[in-house]
Amino acid sequence: MQQEATGGQKIRPIPIIASFLMAGFIGLFSETALNMALSDLIQVFDISSATVQWLTTGYLLTLGILVPISGLLLQWFTTRGLFFTAVSFSIAGTLIAALSPTFAMLMIGRVVQAVGTALLLPLMFNTILLIFPEHKRGSAMGMIGLVIMFAPAVGPTISGLILENLTWNWIFWISLPFLIIALLFGMKFMQNVSVVTKPKIDILSIILSTLGFGGVVFAFSSAGENGWGSATVLVSIIVGGIALGLFVWRQLTMEKPLMDLKVFKYPMFTLGLILVFISFMMILSTMILLPLYLQNSLALAAFSAGLVLLPGGVLNGLMSPFTGRLFDAYGPRALVIPGFIVAVIALFFLTRIEVGTSALTIIVLHSVLMIGISMVMMPAQTNGLNQLPPKLYPDGTAIMNTLQQVSGAIGTAVAITIMSAGQKAYMETAQGVGPEQMIASLTAGIQNAFVFGLIMACIGLLCSLFIRKAK
């Protein structure tokens, strides 16, 4: 931990983390808030559902491309400079989106927003590692977890309220003042805590990283809609896979790599990465499956579906500071192993949901699942990063955040693929093709997709048995 900022003044951790919390909350809120407005946007801009999905795909793609090179940016620019740049991009993107008269302009706004988020998240994690001692990092990461889990959870519900009374533009207008406040607060309190070393920039590594991570994220993001056999998906995953292979080979053979893969020599970091990867797959697949189930099988309106999922999301966020303090006191094993056990139980019962399952049952199961995941996510991530030496913090945070984006794309794509296959298999044996059969087939497909989540949770539980407090 650093006691002084690079300018010599004493570090004040609380105002620094408060700046990140404000900016991060709005950035992650806007990421999911727009999901509720997609059907409205199809009507407003007279576009297809495939086109409107680019608002999500484009956002994820930008994160997948920029987050891997964030480790380099953290070593080239000061903490204050990167913070102001990130929040400025978020403000600019939000303003462009709010004023958008066309879908193309809205798409540009979303990409600019994503640039801000891609810069902010790794900077936030890296700064916490630098300003908090190891025995307090769990609590600090817990506060960050509150934002990362809570903001996306309340996004759909708040946007549902906005859409009932105002137009979709107000999702962005309401976010704008809070981003400006975060920028002004940061101007006063943000301090430079990282050392600017300005390592050599390897252009080829950046190109390979962009093609590799961008290709993989795009392929999985497109697979759910276009199918795994489409030329777009196949070309993207082949190009992405080859580029990733070349990227890894180049990083291992360079004296000063863009992304230092020596982090994988630290077993608790690698294990933490695997556990976070699995957790994100479970979260993102659940976030795509349950709204489909609630709106189609239970015939709930979008706003009502958002309310059903709100308690679980809020609990997940509120649990993060609590699990952070428990991590500082008892280490990772006391949280991660029980967390996966809770997740396995919740997912087992989610595989058994039917057309007649009550909304209350879904609220309980979703809440239990979110509690389990909150016991895994931040403790596993913090424990893994704790094992790294300070010089590898930028690379560790970049890799951790990159794999989260990739796991989210993979989890969503696999869940949709399994669900679609389950629907098709059910309809092949169904008597007739009426509305009741369509609803029953969707429910059967969602059951199958939750089996995938259950298998991932069981794998996570087995892996968690090897976790130890990082030294």
Curated annotation (Swiss-Prot):
Location of the protein in the cell: Cell membrane
GO terms under cellular component: plasma membrane
Keyword terms, alphabetized: Antibiotic resistance, Cell membrane, Membrane, Transmembrane, Transmembrane helix, Transport
Ranges that cross the membrane: 15-34, 55-77, 82-104, 111-131, 141-163, 170-187, 202-224, 231-253, 268-290, 297-319, 329-351, 358-380, 445-467
Swiss-Prot/TrEMBL GO biological process terms: response to antibiotic
UniProt-recorded Gene Ontology molecular function terms: transmembrane transporter activity
Keyword Cell membrane: yes
Membrane topology according to the record: Multi-pass membrane protein
Chief location of this protein within or outside the cell: membrane
Pfam short name (any one): MFS_1
KW Plastid (keyword) present: no
Task performed by this protein: Proton-dependent transporter. May mediate the efflux of lincomycin.
Family: Belongs to the major facilitator superfamily. EmrB family.
Record's protein name: Lincomycin resistance protein LmrB
Species this protein is from: Listeria innocua serovar 6a (strain ATCC BAA-680 / CLIP 11262)
Gene: lmrB
